[in-house]
Amino acid sequence: MEQLTPDGGVTKRIIKAGLGQRPEPTNFVSVHYDAYLLDTSEKFDSSRDRNTEFTFQLRDSKVIEAWELAIPTMQVGELAEIICTSDYGYGDQGRQYIVPPRAQLRFEVELIGFWEKPKSASERIRLAEKKKNEGNALFKLDAIESALFAYRKGREYIQDLWDCEPEELEEARQLIVSIQLNIGACHLKLKHYDHAIEVCQKALDRDMTKIKAYYRIGQAYMEKGDYESSLTFIRIGLETAIGLLAQSIDLIENTLTDNEQFIHESKVMPSSTIVTVLNYDKRDRNIPAENDRWAAKERIIKIQKTIEENSKISLDTPLVLSATIDASDSHQYQFQSSFGRELFYCSIHAIHHYASIKAICIELGLSVPSHFGLAPSTLQHIKKQ
């Protein structure tokens, strides 16, 4: 039990801990609550019973003083019991027909989320980015409902943003697409597959090159048992990938003027890792990355052709997989599968390759062991050296 006033007139007890940040004194907040008379435990109000979140601005004289003091101390997702005397509630007069005079009150309040009210276009974009980052942090903590709330608030800042400079409009467009995809990821986690399809489709309406959107729609259809639609979207994603590779070729031909522009030293992953991802089945090690732009162009063309050739294969084509069960066991086992099944698996696997996880950790300044994220076969190879 925490005393929030020197006289003990307001106390707070955490029933369920929250995550992330706390609201600023003038933020808008959204809460769910149940309100009781302390002496009789009689419920006199409830947003949950109405199935409607209660939204208000802190320090705007819309709620009792006990809430003004307690809610800024709460984290998103926190459920707290707030008890107050009448001095911090409805005072000597009470609340007509509902709260008696000089009544002590008890509330169970859950902080759903909070946000600022922007003024300019640039501020709306800044706050949308801020909400996106907040949602990302909550998503990593597996607080999916809270992350979804943050993403939605971020989207609200910019979804109707039109009266601004062209640069701001483009920045807002890219940001809302990113937020839509994150909302789709939340819906997948929550098994709201129809919502995931809808929101990712809206992302594609703004940017049809977002391969991740096709994969997430495909994943949602797969979870719904609609394998035909799932693989259709995976195929569209592959066609989009071919188009993006064509843009890379155009960049090499018309923008880069020497090889030095093409080379970039990465602190995140070795070049051999990138090459291995591009040619995963070959399993050669320590392959040097290409540093000649014309040779790179030829490599990209080969990748395009590989995708195009595979796109022509019937999804029902049977396949026999030869694989080891354990990295230390060289015996090959055979499994029956189909081209469509393996295409879907590879597509989903590609968007969360270990290198991405490792890159995120490093970008966040997290200490990552050298063996973090390495495949079992790679660890076995290192041990043999």
From Swiss-Prot:
Keywords: Isomerase, Repeat, Rotamase, TPR repeat
InterPro entries hit by this protein: FKBP4/5/8-like, PPIase_dom_sf, PPIase_FKBP_dom, TPR-like_helical_dom_sf, TPR_rpt
A Pfam entry, by short name: TPR_8
Keyword Isomerase: yes
Protein name, entry field: FK506-binding protein 5
TPR repeats mapped onto the chain: 128-161, 177-210, 211-244
Keyword Isomerase belongs to the record: yes
Function: PPIases accelerate the folding of proteins. It catalyzes the cis-trans isomerization of proline imidic peptide bonds in oligopeptides.
EC number(s) from the headed UniProt entry: 5.2.1.8
Source organism: Rhizopus delemar (strain RA 99-880 / ATCC MYA-4621 / FGSC 9543 / NRRL 43880) (Mucormycosis agent)
Catalytic function, reaction form: [protein]-peptidylproline (omega=180) = [protein]-peptidylproline (omega=0)
Record GO terms (molecular function): peptidyl-prolyl cis-trans isomerase activity
Domain (PPIase FKBP-type) ranges: 26-115
SUPFAM superfamilies according to UniProt: FKBP-like, TPR-like
Activity control mechanisms: Inhibited by both FK506 and rapamycin.
